[in-house]
């Protein structure tokens, strides 16, 4: 049995848990998080801005998946491989394994409730994402994409982006908020300190700044850096 694929029952439970968690948080009267002294980044803000970097990689994946679907393989495959390398190092080995899986998820499971019931689904999605990352890295290792590989690679990129967009949206709006509300002010401060230590041990400095800089370079190489290119086209008159 594929351990990375949630069962239908798990998916049903997850769907109910997402809805119930949203209701629970909407009615929760927990204290609002105080700003860190000196303008320091809180643990939740740190997690969410890291998601911002990862979402920029998802944009790269969606755009290149569209090119592949159109039969185009003449773009910089090495840059796509670098995006997957960055997702592995920053998203999976650091953000997921060291922060979410070591700190956030155990606290959610300890607190119990509907959000805790969704943790197995989040973990399964982490595992599936690592499979996707390995596939992308392998297909881009030579610096070019073989035309025969284009359909499968495009599907993996598209499916991964779809999954991770839902995954990060749930974490940002439900899981991280439940995690924050499950802790005292002192525990939140301690979590922020722990996250900073983990970041320094991994990157010897600002991991977020490093990752944001790298994804900007990847966007430039692929011609995806201009924000205006994503502006929606003209909307027909109603």
Positions of PLM-derived features:
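Small-residue-biased structural context
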Residues: 1-238
């Amino acid at each position: 049995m594929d351990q990375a694929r949630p069962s239908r029952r798990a998916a049903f439970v997850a769907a109910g848990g997402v809805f119930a968690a949203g209701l629970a948080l909407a009615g929760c009267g927990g204290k609002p998080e105080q700003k860190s002294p000196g303008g320091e980044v809180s643990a939740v803000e740190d997690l969410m801005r890291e998601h911002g970097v990862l979402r920029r990689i998802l944009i790269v994946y969606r755009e290149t998946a569209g090119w592949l679907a159109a039969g185009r393989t003449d773009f910089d495959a090495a840059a796509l491989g670098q995006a997957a390398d960055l997702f592995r190092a920053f998203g999976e080995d650091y953000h997921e394994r060291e922060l979410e899986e070591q700190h956030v998820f155990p606290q959610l499971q300890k607190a119990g409730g509907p959000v805790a019931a969704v943790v197995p689904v989040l973990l399964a999605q982490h595992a599936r994402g690592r499979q996707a990352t390995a596939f992308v890295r392998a297909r881009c290792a030579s610096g070019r994409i073989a035309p025969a590989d284009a359909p499968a690679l495009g599907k993996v990129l598209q499916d991964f982006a779809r999954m991770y967009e839902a995954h990060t949206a749930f974490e940002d709006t439900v899981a991280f908020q439940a995690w924050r509300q499950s802790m005292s002010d002192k525990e939140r401060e301690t979590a922020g300190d722990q996250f900073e230590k983990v970041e320094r041990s991994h990157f010897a400095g600002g991991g977020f700044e490093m990752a944001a800089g790298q994804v900007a370079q990847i966007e430039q190489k692929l011609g995806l850096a201009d924000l205006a290119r994503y502006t929606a086209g003209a909307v027909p008159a109603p």
